[in-house]
């Protein structure tokens, strides 16, 4: 037990993230500012201090579902390490990431069936959404039928890559004009949340529709000349030169 403070301090200060930040006048970098720390071994607090924040038994509930606990300096006390998960669950924070992921998956699947289709669940997207929410609630939104005239990829890409939505498909694999998103919160006022998400997606799809229609005004052959104006790499010519080399290589591989 005497070794734990030093070990925990070393672990926390050695963590790496793709993007980090500094705050106040500290040189320490972390993924987000540290506001409080819970470090327990059984009933005892493991003493650790980072950027002036000392470890203790106090945590906070969900930012929106239990705002008083977030604003109140007293917070909620976790009496021992074994109680950590349940105390936070009682305050609308689902700590178990595996349970949270499977809850999201099941909510998305069930809601898609209710809407007359089935959800296309990308595992990478599911993993990302899992770490964006503490108390997941799935909800369904819609978009105008006219956008279904776009290629499937033009609809799914802004849904998945930009908005973190799950597409809803028919039995034949074609898209329904619906999507499922996951809210970090409860079931109150879901229609308001859905409306906001629909508005954002509508703008994305309108952009996709515009660029798709603009691209169709010219055949692909008409765009070849533009490849000459884009550099590929110093000493290796432009994108047209690269394309021609690929044509020759493909011909040689195919026909010898």
Region annotations inferred by a language model:
Residues 1-148, 155:
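Long, basic N-terminal domains or extensions that often function
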Residues 28, 42-46, 52-55, 171-173, ...:
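Short, glycine-/Ser/Thr-/acidic-enriched flexible segments
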Residues 107-111, 226, 249-252:
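A general alpha-helix detector
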Residues 115-120, 212, 253-256:
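Inter-helical turn/loop segments and adjacent helix faces that build the functional surface
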Residues 120-244:
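Catalytic nucleotidyl-transfer cores of nucleotide-processing enzymes
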């Amino acid at each position: 037990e005497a070794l734990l403070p030093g070990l925990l301090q070393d672990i926390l200060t050695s963590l790496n993230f793709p993007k980090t930040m500094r705050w106040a006048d500290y040189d320490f970098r972390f993924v987000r500012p540290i506001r409080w720390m819970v470090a327990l071994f059984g009933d005892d607090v493991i003493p650790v201090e980072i950027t002036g924040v000392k470890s203790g038994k106090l945590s906070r509930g969900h930012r929106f579902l239990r705002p008083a606990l977030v604003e109140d300096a007293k917070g909620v006390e976790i009496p021992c390490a074994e109680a950590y998960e349940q105390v936070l669950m009682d305050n609308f924070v689902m700590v178990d990431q595996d349970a949270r992921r499977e809850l999201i998956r099941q909510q998305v699947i069930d809601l898609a069936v209710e809407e007359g289709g089935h959800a296309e669940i990308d595992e990478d997207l599911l993993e990302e959404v899992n770490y964006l929410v503490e108390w997941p609630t799935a909800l369904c939104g819609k978009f105008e039928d006219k956008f279904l005239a776009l290629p499937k990829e033009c609809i799914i890409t802004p849904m998945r890559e930009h908005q973190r939505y799950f597409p809803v498909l028919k039995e034949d694999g074609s898209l329904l004009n619906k999507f499922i998103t996951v809210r970090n919160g409860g079931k109150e006022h879901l229609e308001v949340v859905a409306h906001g998400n629909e508005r954002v997606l509508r703008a994305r799809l309108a952009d996709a529709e515009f660029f798709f229609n603009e691209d169709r005004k010219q055949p692909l052959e008409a765009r070849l000349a533009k490849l000459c104006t884009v550099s590929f790499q110093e000493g290796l010519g432009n994108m047209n030169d690269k394309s021609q080399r690929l044509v020759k290589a493909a011909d040689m591989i195919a026909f010898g």
